[in-house]
């Protein structure tokens, strides 16, 4: 696809954990990148980057963002402030879709959603055919945006990605357990150790977003992104694997509760949630020929090596 027309891409959320890897990969592949940002950012060292300073709800700015673009990556989202989630995740997506409908050059649109849209589930394996029942505001707004994308009638290839728990060296997330190894974290390991971690490195999410740009998608496709086919992608499995990189090679001897116990604890406090034994299937990804460039072990090794350098 990138060989047949001008390499101009547009991206929202370019400063986020996934967006910045997409920008890096596009630049490395020789693309010109136009990004939307609420604040002026210094990209003076990247002549192929242009910044459009505006909010996601600014219709004129979005049309400027998309002008001449062949590929669009929508990564912008509000993850923390519930009072802004509808405005950003739903209304912002609606504005972007309106801009896409009047932009004739776009051939590929990638929407970054979340595996969390599946909501509470007891299913052992979750795939793209499972029904979604989002339970919190973030999940609901991301799923509503998904449905808007699916029903917008876009005349282009559309890919919806649902990453699990995204991490990298700057935002290690669950990997903080073996990094800090405090009493508090050991208690968490005891309680949640046998639950799925659903980790996915941001670099592998970006790789998937660019991979499907080069596939001929006959219809809108949805993909879960998680290393869950690797049996070590549990809270305790990640802890053991990360600790195994140390030259000290100290044995990791600990006991973790069955995954049903933390589920019951969450249910008593917050109601139904995703059961800790759930795994997100990689079967559909593989059927399209995509293999994670990093995978679980290599992605954790990246974090480990970066922390070693810092220390």
Question: What do the predicted segments below correspond to?
Answer:
Residues 143, 167-177, 212-224:
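Glycine/proline-rich active-site loop of Rossmann-fold NAD(P)-dependent oxidoreductases
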Residues 9-29:
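N-terminal Rossmann NAD(P)H-binding glycine-rich loop of SDR-like oxidoreductase domains
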Residues 122-161, 165-166, 188-190:
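Catalytic helix-loop patch of NAD(P)-dependent Rossmann-fold dehydrogenases
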Residues 41, 45, 53-91, 95, ...:
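NAD(P)H-binding glycine-rich loop region in Rossmannoid oxidoreductase-like domains
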Residues 154-160, 164-197, 202, 242:
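NAD(P)-dependent short-chain dehydrogenase/reductase
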Residues 91, 95-137, 159:
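Conserved Rossmann-fold NAD(P)-dependent oxidoreductase catalytic core, especially the SDR/UDP-sugar
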Residues 208-269, 304, 310-311:
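Mid/C-terminal beta-alpha module of Rossmann-like enzyme folds, strongest
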Residues 8, 286-287, 294-311:
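Amphipathic terminal alpha-helices
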């Amino acid at each position: 696809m990138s060989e047949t027309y001008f390499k101009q891409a547009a991206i929202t959320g370019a400063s986020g954990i996934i967006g910045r890897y997409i920008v890096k990969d596009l630049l490395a592949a020789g693309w010109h990148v136009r990004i939307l940002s609420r604040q002026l950012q210094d990209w003076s060292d990247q002549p192929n980057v242009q910044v459009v300073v505006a909010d996601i709800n600014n219709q004129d700015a979005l049309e400027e963002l998309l002008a001449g673009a062949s590929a669009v990556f929508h990564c912008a989202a509000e993850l923390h402030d519930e009072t802004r989630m509808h405005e950003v995740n739903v209304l912002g997506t609606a504005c972007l879709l309106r801009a896409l409908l009047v932009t004739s050059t776009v051939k590929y649109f990638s929407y970054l959603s979340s595996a969390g849209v599946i909501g509470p589930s007891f299913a052992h394996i979750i795939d793209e055919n499972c029904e979604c029942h989002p339970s919190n505001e973030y999940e609901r707004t991301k799923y509503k945006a998904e449905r808007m994308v699916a029903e917008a009638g876009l005349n282009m290839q559309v890919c919806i990605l649902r990453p699990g728990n995204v991490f990298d060296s700057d935002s290690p997330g669950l990997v903080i357990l073996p990094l800090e190894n405090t009493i508090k974290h050991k208690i968490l390991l005891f309680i949640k150790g046998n639950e799925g971690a659903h980790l996915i490195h941001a670099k592998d999410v970006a790789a998937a977003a660019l991979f499907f740009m080069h596939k001929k998608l006959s219809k809108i496709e949805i993909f879960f992104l998680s290393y869950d086919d690797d049996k070590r992608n549990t809270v305790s499995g990640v802890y053991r694997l990360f600790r195994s990189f140390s030259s000290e090679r100290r044995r990791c001897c600990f006991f973790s509760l069955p995954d049903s116990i933390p589920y019951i604890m969450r249910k008593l406090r917050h109601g139904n949630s995703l059961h800790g034994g759930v795994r997100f299937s990689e079967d559909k990804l593989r059927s399209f020929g995509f293999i994670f460039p990093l995978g679980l072990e290599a992605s954790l090794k990246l974090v480990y090596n970066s922390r070693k350098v810092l220390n």
